[in-house]
Amino acid sequence: DTARRQSEEARFYLGMLARLLISAVIEGDRRVTAGFEQDVRFPQDRTPEELRILWETLSDRVDRKLGELPHRTEVEKARREISDRCRAFAEKPGGVYRLNVPTGAGKTLSSLRYALAHAALHGKSRILFVAPILAIIDQNSKVIRQYIGDDSLILEHHSNAVQTGLSQNELDERELLVQSWDAPIIIT
């Protein structure tokens, strides 16, 4: 009985290993094909130096746009202070942190500043924005896209993410990115 159970367990694990290897081969084939045919570049294809430059460039872009915002009222000054503290907090090691501030306090841009600076300082290959409610994802996505200024760097992956007006190559590239979450900034 023990020998039979061990044999079944061994077959199960061998089956799982075979599935893993087949998945890796298929994923590798898709990447090579996409890279060759469509000139798709994945985040892990970027060198650490290229990623650092990307994050620093985006961080500078966001800082520049934020610098253009007025900060005359007390609310505007408070938003700026929260944002600056989040940016400074990026030097801390990675972890799970909470940002508890009231509605309208600038959480999206404050967390974006933190994420970009943290990614640059700590060699991260991607940034994930995760929210439990689609309305929040949609709202944050619009703000992030506006400040990043390059939709090709952002992947939205949720049930409301519908792409219109894209060519077949762009749709194929997006599908590949969705399957692997290989975009520098992922919103889900």
Feature map (PLM): residue ranges:
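Inter-Walker segment of RecA-like/P-loop motor cores
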Residues: 150-188
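Conserved Walker A/P-loop ATP-binding site and its immediately adjacent core
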Residues: 124-147, 161
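Catalytic cores of nucleotide-enabled group-transfer and carboxylate-activating enzymes in metabolic
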Residues: 59, 106, 112, 144-153, ...
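Post-Walker A helix-loop "phosphate-sensing" segment adjacent to the P-loop in P-loop NTPases
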Residues: 117-126, 148-152
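Walker A/P-loop
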Residues: 92-118
